[in-house]
Amino acid sequence: ATAYNRGQILYRIAEMLEGRADQFESEIALTSQITSAKAKALVSEAIDRWVWYAGWSDKLQAVSGATNPVSGPFFNFSISEPQGVVAIASSDSFLEFIDAIAAAVVSGNTSVVLVPGSLAVPSMSFAEVLATSDLPAGVINILTGSLDELAPWAASHMDIDGFDISGIAKKKQGALKEAGAENLKRIHSFGSGKTPARILAFMESKTVWHSVGV
């Protein structure tokens, strides 16, 4: 899909999530033990996050790409590309769950999302949203269970290129980084909040040389 089409799909996810806002509010209030008012504000912010990330889809090259200065009769360009398959260890916050997924897929990555049991119900409802949002099959894959069991598997998996371990306690992150070192897996942890740095963390730069006048 083109960058523009990815943005359209992410925006469609926001629309479908908004259409089921009442369901998510009740599920989050129940599973997270928060008030209905707080759950409503959280779902509203989650919808806004999808729209925010959707807007980045066709602007990433303008921000991260470059024409590099060279001393010769040729051009040199740096172009950002998606890394590939990104695993995500989600925290039990629905908003952080959304942030991690949107940041990974907006650039064109596919994702394997590891979700703790405390967020299982909202995450499975969100999988239903994805199924009706024109998202190609296999782009976002959600697994629920114990992160203590799932995260080491993801860290050592040779076909996973990046790993967002924001949902893992800091004292356990070192072991995951060691496990991911064998295939040079790019492993990052982020704080809460939206930032383009989270998108760029799972992109790679390709440098292209081209002769002038050819």
Which residue ranges define each predicted feature?
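N-terminal Rossmann-like NAD(P)+-binding subdomain of aldehyde/semialdehyde dehydrogenases
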Residues: 1-75, 103, 116-117
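Short acidic active-site motifs
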Residues: 38, 149-150
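C-terminal segments
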Residues: 37, 42, 48-63, 76-77, ...
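Glycine-rich beta-to-alpha transition loops that act as phosphate-gripper elements at the mouths
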Residues: 89-92, 143-148, 166-168, 190-192
